[in-house]
Design a protein with these regions (language model features):
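Active-site beta-loop-alpha junctions of metal-dependent nucleic acid enzymes
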Residues: 44, 63-89
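Mobile genetic element proteins and their domesticated derivatives, centered on retroelements
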Residues: 34, 51, 57, 77, ...
Length: 214
């Protein structure tokens, strides 16, 4: 190792009790990814791979898959890369990827792909899914809605996932984000919105004072 004969791993293993040294401070510093499964009547189980931006909780990419292979993970990451434009030469840094230790995430094929893209891989401690808490909560919220219905074709399920992702990203206010939407935070609209809210609140309070004094 002293003579650089042993290379450092492209991934980092974090313990369940560990926290990141510094919370993310901007979009595309850390991406969380995970699979969940959904059933299509008479078709069987399908697997949803999602990628969530840790800072904003914005869903960057998702794919409904027939399995949980490294290739399907790569395809979803590729969609996130294209969406975010991180290959642009002007982008100076790459996000880290946080996942669990499923077979698709520890595969050689994914390791080589991430190395080529300059994306460092962080994996949670085995059997502690709370490490990927944000993506886990997102999938749980999504399934609480989607599982109210039955789906009879993969296309029907995909359409409902697309509708939910749009709702979650653009219309669902999140308490942990100062009651902003993930899109507000991801696209940097948060400060302006919060300032306007304060102004409206101040005007409302002043009107109430005037009314009470009259």
């Amino acid at each position: 190792k002293a003579h650089d004969l042993i290379t450092s791993p492209v991934y980092t293993l974090i313990m369940a009790r560990d926290k990141f040294p510094q919370p993310t401070r901007s979009p595309n510093e850390l991406w969380q990814t995970d699979f969940t499964w959904l059933k299509v009547v008479h078709w069987g189980w399908y697997y949803l791979c999602s990628i969530l931006d840790d800072y904003s909780r914005y869903i960057l990419a998702w794919q409904l898959c027939i399995g949980m292979s490294a290739e399907e993970v790569k395809q979803t990451i590729e969609a996130a890369i294209r969406f975010t434009g991180i290959r642009d030469p002007k982008v100076m840094s790459r996000p880290r990827l946080l996942s669990d230790n499923g077979p698709c995430y520890v595969s050689k094929a994914l390791k080589e792909y991430l190395e080529d893209e300059g994306i460092r891989h962080t994996r949670g401690k085995p059997y502690h899914p709370m490490t990927q808490g944000k993506i886990e909560r997102y999938h749980r919220s999504m399934k609480n809605i989607l599982l109210l219905e039955h789906y009879y074709s993969p296309d029907e399920l995909e359409n409902q996932i697309e509708l939910f992702v749009d709702y979650y990203n653009n219309h669902r206010y999140h308490e942990a984000l100062n009651n902003l939407t993930p899109a507000d935070v991801y696209y940097g609209r948060g400060p302006e919105i919060l300032t306007k809210r304060k102004q409206v609140k101040r005007r409302t309070m002043n009107l109430r004072k005037r009314y009470n004094l009259s």
